[in-house]
Design a protein with these regions (language model features):
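Short amphipathic helix-loop junctions that connect adjacent transmembrane helices
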Residues: 38-58
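C-terminal ends and interior cores of transmembrane alpha-helices
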Residues: 96-110
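Conserved small/polar residues in nucleotide/adenosyl-binding loops
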Residues: 152-157
């Protein structure tokens, strides 16, 4: 897959397409770290306080599996985009799947809780490895701006909202 390299420097002296990638990455990281901050607390809260009532050990195990799945699913997500659907579609589908996962998590049914976690992890596995590759494709091979840390700034920017 090739992405059109833009000479448009409308985003802090970088290609205009970086703006979309920057904010997509920022909100994906907000989703991920926000989930990490609340997941164990929600699982261990009592049923009377609208939690799931899991033991700390069970909640910790689920948290570990979720976190591991988020990072592991980047491998098949990268393969899928390289071989079948392309990076743009992988980022798009990944974002939609993450959104649907959060919608499912908002539904007050314990049975859907795990479905929501699986959807968020799967969507992140599609989005995360591909968005980083797309940032590099915004620049020419000899463009000094290619090594900029601007994408990582989007990770830090979401800290302002947490």
């Amino acid at each position: 897959m090739t992405i059109k390299k833009s000479n448009d420097t409308s985003f802090f002296g970088h290609p205009g397409g970086l703006r979309t990638l920057f904010f997509t990455e920022m909100w994906e990281r907000m989703s991920y770290y926000g989930m990490r901050a609340l997941l164990v607390l929600f699982m261990t809260a009592s049923l009377q306080t609208q939690g799931l009532g899991f033991t700390v050990a069970t909640a910790g195990a689920i948290y570990g599996l979720y976190t591991g799945a988020v990072y592991f699913l980047g491998l098949p997500g990268g393969w899928l985009s390289d071989r079948l659907i392309g990076g743009k579609k992988a980022v798009w589908y990944g974002g939609i799947i993450i959104f649907l996962g959060h919608v499912v998590l908002a539904i007050d049914l314990q049975n859907l809780f795990f479905v929501g976690l699986i959807l968020v992890a799967t969507g992140t596995g599609l989005l995360k490895p591909n968005i980083s590759a797309m940032v590099g494709q915004q620049y020419g091979d000899d463009d000094a701006r290619r090594d900029s840390c601007l994408l990582y700034t989007s990770d830090a920017a979401d800290d302002l909202f947490r």
